[in-house]
């Protein structure tokens, strides 16, 4: 699940509407998004259409991820300003963040701080996330102090908590914090810190800045430099244009993008990047009834991947017949791939790769 965050009036809800076509109320005033709007978004994957043609399939089922449009944040959110407490509670529930940053001038759309400054806006939100995390760490530290004297494990955790807190107090994000060992890593992940969640920046621009990916937009360049230091990705989008594209059918959309000099929409890139940011990949199953992308975490072994289809497949797993999508395309048919020795039998320890086409064998 990804949370779309940003200051009020930066284009969050417009972007969310484009992603989900959900029609979330998008108004030119702060806090028009009070309850988070949730939408399930399909992940673009051209491989499914190709397999669909190969197998003359009746149904194509793409992978999907969930996006949540979270209320606009303001300074002082960690102290309850605006919808701060609600915002922070909502964002704690997501796995990763799409941070929408305003990089366009428009006198008709008010900015809460009265001027356009993308880095200031990013840092405003980061500070509120930091303050919220520090507050949470302080509560944990207060509890740990009471028992640390008589419990070595708690004493060790207390030392970690204090190190993380000191790190955040330097206005740094927990995702760049360095742990000393695997135990500390497990603890760090268990705290569900807002500043530990992975982030993608969506630089929202005007139509004029789209064709050259915001190369002439100083705000976009500043965001890219900032993101590089934070080891985050940046995608240039025009939320208004994306909303228009979302209303078109496939042929119209293709023509529209060609007119803009684009191969794919900014949102398609953003969705794919978001899927990857969550550490997700797709393996594929194909046949006449359906072609489907199954979502798994990177590093998932074959039995657990099989369990995504049905729990019986995981319990009774023996082996899987696997061919990579690229090998299948090169050979033209599954039979030809098998004749060339490109279809492999893999056992319980096999780690499934993105684009693997699988056929499972289990006890009869």
What do these predicted ranges mean?
Residues 1-74, 85, 91:
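Conserved G1/Walker A P-loop phosphate-binding module
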Residues 2-5, 16, 146-351:
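C-terminal-of-GTPase-core extension/linker across diverse P-loop GTPases
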Residues 36, 63, 92-96, 196-198, ...:
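Short glycine-/polar-rich loops that comprise or flank the Walker A/P-loop
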Residues 85-102:
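Inter-motif core of Ras-like GTPase G domains
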Residues 354-356:
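Structural motif
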Residues 360-364:
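Conserved small/polar residues in nucleotide/adenosyl-binding loops
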């Amino acid at each position: 699940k990804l949370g779309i965050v940003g200051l009020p009036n930066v284009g969050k809800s417009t972007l969310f509407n484009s992603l989900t076509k959900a029609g979330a109320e998008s108004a030119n005033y702060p806090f028009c998004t009070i309850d988070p709007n949730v939408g399930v978004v399909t992940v673009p994957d051209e491989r499914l259409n190709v397999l669909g043609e190969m197998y003359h399939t009746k149904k194509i089922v793409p992978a999907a991820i969930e996006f949540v449009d979270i209320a606009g944040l303001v300074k002082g959110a960690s102290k309850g300003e605006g919808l701060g407490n609600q915002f922070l509670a909502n964002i704690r529930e997501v796995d990763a963040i799409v941070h929408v940053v305003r990089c366009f001038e428009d006198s008709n759309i008010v900015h809460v701080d009265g001027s356009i400054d993308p880095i200031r806006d990013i840092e405003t939100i980061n500070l509120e996330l930091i303050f919220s995390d520090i507050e949470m760490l302080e509560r944990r530290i207060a509890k740990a102090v009471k028992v640390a004297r008589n419990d070595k494990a708690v004493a060790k955790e207390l030392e970690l908590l204090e190190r993380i807190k000191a790190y955040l107090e330097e206005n740094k994000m927990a995702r760049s914090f360095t742990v000393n060992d695997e135990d500390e890593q497990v603890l760090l992940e268990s705290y569900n810190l807002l500043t530990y969640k992975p982030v993608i920046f969506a630089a929202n621009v005007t139509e004029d800045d789209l064709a050259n990916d915001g190369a002439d937009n100083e705000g976009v360049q500043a965001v890219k430099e900032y993101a590089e230091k934070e080891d985050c990705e940046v995608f240039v989008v025009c939320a208004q244009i994306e909303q228009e594209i979302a209303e078109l059918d496939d042929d119209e959309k293709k023509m529209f993008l060609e007119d803009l000099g684009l191969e794919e929409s900014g949102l398609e890139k953003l969705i794919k990047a978001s899927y990857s940011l969550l550490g997700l990949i797709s393996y594929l199953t194909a046949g006449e009834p359906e072609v489907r992308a199954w979502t798994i975490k990177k590093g998932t072994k074959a039995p657990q991947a099989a369990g995504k289809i049905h729990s019986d497949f995981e319990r009774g797993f023996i082996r899987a017949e696997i061919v990579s999508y690229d090998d299948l395309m090169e050979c033209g048919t599954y039979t030809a791939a098998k004749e060339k020795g490109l279809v492999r039998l893999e056992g319980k320890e096999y780690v499934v790769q993105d684009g693997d086409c699988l056929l499972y064998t289990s006890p009869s």
